[in-house]
A protein has these predicted regions:
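Alpha-helical bundle regulatory/interaction domains
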Residues: 1-3, 105-149
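Generic protein-terminus/edge-of-domain signal
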Residues: 1-72, 77, 88-120
Length: 149
């Protein structure tokens, strides 16, 4: 029964845009996802609501969100930030990274998809991720995502 309610709600949410990129990283590494107010106008202009996601395709990593315990992820796992909150993906818990500058976001927006980000040597990659942002109507997103963290 609950699956039917979720299916009905998912049918009402229309994605209005998407952007994605790949990360190949050698430990130690850390990359910050900036606030949605910085991302939306550059990567998904005109979008109302931002959902960020990271799918670990190889190795391990950690998702760090201010005020929350780190979440360890391994290959095959996905983490979704339903409200597009700023966060840091890294090789170890508690690592920090400066958010990308607006110039970097502009380059990413103009780049061919997927945009590839390399940290370190290709011979010593400890993690690979497919990351991205989904845009949808804010009103419908609130209805669907209201009960999620």
């Amino acid at each position: 029964m609950a699956a039917d309610v979720l299916s009905d709600r998912l049918k009402t949410v229309r994605l209005t845009g998407a952007a994605f990129f790949e990360i190949a990283a050698e430990a130690p590494w850390a990359v910050a996802s900036p606030p949605r107010e910085m991302i939306l106008p550059r990567i998904l202009p005109g979008a109302d609501h931002l959902i960020a996601y990271h799918a670990v395709t190889a190795g391990r990593c950690v998702a760090n969100v201010a005020g929350s315990p780190p979440i360890e992820l391994q290959a095959g796992e996905v983490i979704v930030f339903t409200h597009g909150d700023p966060h840091v993906m890294s090789s170890s818990p508690g690592m920090r990274a400066d958010p990308p500058t607006t110039d970097v976001l502009d380059v990413a927006a103009a780049a061919q998809v997927p945009f590839l980000i390399n940290y370190g040597s290709a011979d010593a990659i400890s993690a690979k991720l497919v990351c991205g942002y989904l845009a949808c109507d804010a009103r419908l997103a609130r209805m669907l995502l209201a009960g999620l963290p």
